[in-house]
Amino acid sequence: MAGHSKWANIKHRKAAQDAQRGKIFTKLIRELVTAAKIGGGDAGSNPRLRAAVDKALASNMTRDTINRAIDRGVGGGDDTNMETRIYEGYGPGGTAVMVECLSDNANRTISQVRPSFTKCGGNLGTEGSVGYLFNKKGLIIIDAGADEDALTEAAIEAGADDIQPQDDGSFEIYTAWEELGDVRDGIEKAGFKIAEAEVSMIPTTSVDLDAETAPKLLRLIEMLEDCDDVQNVYHNGEISDEVAALL
């Protein structure tokens, strides 16, 4: 699958950079508040909230801060009127890009997102322009070192749709997005440690990028992730090991 395991190092590096600037905490708190408002404050029965809590803990957010954000979401109020907005567009090399935002002001958000596409040789599209190239799925990451046969058996037993070993030894497990929480619980009960679990947009096709185009896509991703309202960026660009070595 393009746009996921091959970009794990980029994702983690960006997370560290955002943390230094304080941006990641703002984004995480927004997600905690929104997830609690929509699905309730019990992470055990709210997969979106559970994923948000896990991300917050991984970023060294304190339990107290997390709980306060959840309480805000459950309590409602004017400061919780965030809506999920999805923007679709074309990036360098004809790549399909989907931008997931949490925002209380659509005009502000679009004024952040549109220039990012324009400056990187892409263009913002209309609703549905590239969405058909992605499937909404649950994605579970298991770090390297797990026994493949045992993990495969546990994943299938838990209800997973597919499991794919990665070049770095890790595993990506795909589920129906509605069943992410149940599959995660089943895999954990089988004794496997989950590195990450989230609802994601998985590309159905990929676009191979050359050494000239790849940096432009990476720049677009960075610019979008720098926008305060942007929570996630999904794309179908793929960079070969040969091209990556030239970057």
UniProtKB/Swiss-Prot annotation:
GO biological process, one term: regulation of DNA-templated transcription
Gene3D superfamilies documented for this protein: 1.10.10.200, 3.30.70.980
Keyword NADP: no
Compartments where located: Cytoplasm
Keyword terms: Cytoplasm, DNA-binding, Transcription, Transcription regulation
This protein's record includes keyword Ligase: no
Pfam families for the chain: TACO1_YebC_N, Transcrip_reg
GO molecular function, one term: DNA binding
InterPro entries referenced in this protein's UniProt entry, alphabetically: Integrase-like_N, TACO1_YebC-like_2nd/3rd_dom, TACO1_YebC_N, Transcrip_reg_TACO1-like, Transcrip_reg_TACO1-like_dom3, YebC-like
GO cellular component, one term: cytosol
Coiled coil: none
Stated family: Belongs to the TACO1 family.
UniProt-recorded name of the protein: Probable transcriptional regulatory protein MS0710
Source organism per UniProt: Mannheimia succiniciproducens (strain KCTC 0769BP / MBEL55E)
Taxonomy of the source species: Bacteria, Pseudomonadati, Pseudomonadota, Gammaproteobacteria, Pasteurellales
